[in-house]
UniProtKB/Swiss-Prot annotation:
Protein's UniProt name: N-alpha-acetyltransferase 30
Listed EC numbers: 2.3.1.256
Ranges for domain N-acetyltransferase: 3-159
Root EC class: transferase
Organism: Saccharomyces cerevisiae (strain ATCC 204508 / S288c)
Functional summary from the UniProt entry: Catalytic component of the NatC N-terminal acetyltransferase, which catalyzes acetylation of the N-terminus Met of L-A virus GAG protein and possibly GRH1.
Keywords: Acyltransferase, Cytoplasm, Nucleus, Transferase
Assembly and interaction partners: Component of the N-terminal acetyltransferase C (NatC) complex, which is composed of MAK3, MAK10 and MAK31.
Record's subcellular location: Cytoplasm; Nucleus
Lineage of the organism: Eukaryota, Fungi, Dikarya, Ascomycota, Saccharomycotina
Family membership noted in the UniProt record: Belongs to the acetyltransferase family. MAK3 subfamily.
Further remark: Present with 1940 molecules/cell in log phase SD medium.
Principal subcellular localization: cytoplasm
Length: 176
């Protein structure tokens, strides 16, 4: 196994089809083609793949992370991890963690104040991964998923702005 991490080439339809297949097989939510295009067309620099150069198909992703970033309430820049998937035969080798680290690093360089995501309450592997990387449970969202499963919203604070209520930031109450 020789894992290489790189940005997704959005012009490569084979890579796109592979990450769609990987995510569709791995996540509980079905995503339409429009959701993928929304992320990939607006934030192509925030999608990374992992490939195994020693496999018979070295250009086919065995892991991926799909992210975006937006202003949040016009007071902070929020990164968002929308999708993270690793092929089941490659789990347990730190691939998901490395993909998250790459995404966090990129969002920090883009001056995000925080990074947010949701994950299923029952997904202990994901919760252990994210909380081990510093993400904090912010709230439980009941019946969040189509399967009526609950989700936790997790946030990784990156700057002081992330630790200050938006109301105070909007009204200029943050001491600088």
């Amino acid at each position: 196994m020789e894992i290489v991490y790189k940005p997704l080439d959005i012009r490569n339809e084979e890579q796109f089809a592979s990450i769609k297949k990987l995510i569709d097989a791995d996540l509980s939510e079905p995503y339409s083609i429009y959701v993928y295009r929304y992320f990939l067309n607006q934030w192509p620099e925030l999608t990374y793949i992992a490939v195994d150069n020693k496999s018979g198909t070295p250009n086919i992703p065995i892991g991926c992370i799909v992210c975006k970033m937006d202003p949040h309430r016009n007071v902070r820049l929020r990164g968002y991890i929308g999708m993270l998937a690793v092929e089941s035969t490659y789990r347990g080798h730190g691939i998901a963690k490395k993909l998250v680290e790459i995404a966090i690093d990129k969002m920090q360089r883009e001056h995000c104040d925080e990074i947010m995501l949701e994950t299923e309450v029952e997904n202990s592997a994901a919760l252990n991964l994210y909380e081990g990387m510093g993400f904090i449970r912010m709230k439980r969202m009941f019946r969040y998923y189509l399967n009526e499963g609950d989700a936790f919203k997790l946030i990784l604070p990156l700057t002081e702005k992330s630790c200050t209520r938006s109301t105070f930031l909007m009204h200029g109450r943050l001491a600088t």
